[in-house]
């Protein structure tokens, strides 16, 4: 089976072609970072309009790169949600229209299921069951995964997601958009400076996250300290260590609770070097394994949507002709793949 994947949930237009026998045949991506940089964040209306401009040329390029004609496709997968409703509708309209015109089945894919399954695009793919840590700009959650569509959300953020906390803290430090990667780069220059940042919600039972208080603590620390480059780097390091330690503590709890010894990390924040190193050390000490996608598949992309959609289309799951976007969509409401 060969599937065209379309990702337009936020500020990246991702198109890919995936074949269940040959693997990933093509992958094209357009990022809107420069478009939104002057605003310090994503402007939904601008994002939607840019998707409209870029999506068709990218589809043509992906099909050309995959040496694939319309007749070679067996289905179309597009991101249905969660995400920005205007951006989602661009991908949904194009995906559904192509499916109708080409007489192909189509399915709307859950964006976070795409991230969760992204490590399966790698040669060293995880086997079920496992615990997944999904960390991005909009989501932070721990999920018990027993199969595709067999998900139990063990914990999630009650306020700011980890990626959102990175971006907002970067803005407090005067770093340009996108702030998360820039803060991590600054933190790499930091030294242990004796800052005692809290590890939120680790002093109580449970697997939920909360990062808004940590952001406020960082803001107060910035205001009380000298405004020089090394001090800012030291504060960035302390903040990053606090976020990573918090995520690691909750991952360890989730693994103990489930009895699983495989951990998947995915989403934009999974590209963070300190997070990867910390979780790798933790899993090594526990005698387990950690899996994550390559850097280009940590952020939003069409490959993960094509792969996820293919799994469901193969199982006979597809949707009617209605164009649907679902900005809020609980992960654990998805049907299982038999």
From Swiss-Prot:
Gene3D superfamilies: 3.30.420.40. Transmembrane segments: none annotated. The keyword Lyase does not apply. It catalyses: L-threonylcarbamoyladenylate + adenosine(37) in tRNA = N(6)-L-threonylcarbamoyladenosine(37) in tRNA + AMP + H(+). Binds 1 Fe(2+) ion per subunit. Keywords: Acyltransferase, Cytoplasm, Iron, Metal-binding, Transferase, tRNA processing. PROSITE patterns: GLYCOPROTEASE. GO terms for biological process: tRNA threonylcarbamoyladenosine modification. Pfam families: TsaD. Its cofactor is Fe(2+). Its EC number is 2.3.1.234. GO terms for molecular function: iron ion binding; N(6)-L-threonylcarbamoyladenine synthase activity. SUPFAM superfamilies: Actin-like ATPase domain. Required for the formation of a threonylcarbamoyl group on adenosine at position 37 (t(6)A37) in tRNAs that read codons beginning with adenine. Is involved in the transfer of the threonylcarbamoyl moiety of threonylcarbamoyl-AMP (TC-AMP) to the N6 group of A37, together with TsaE and TsaB. TsaD likely plays a direct catalytic role in this reaction. This is tRNA N6-adenosine threonylcarbamoyltransferase. It comes from Shewanella baltica (strain OS155 / ATCC BAA-1091). The lineage of its organism: Bacteria, Pseudomonadati, Pseudomonadota, Gammaproteobacteria, Alteromonadales.
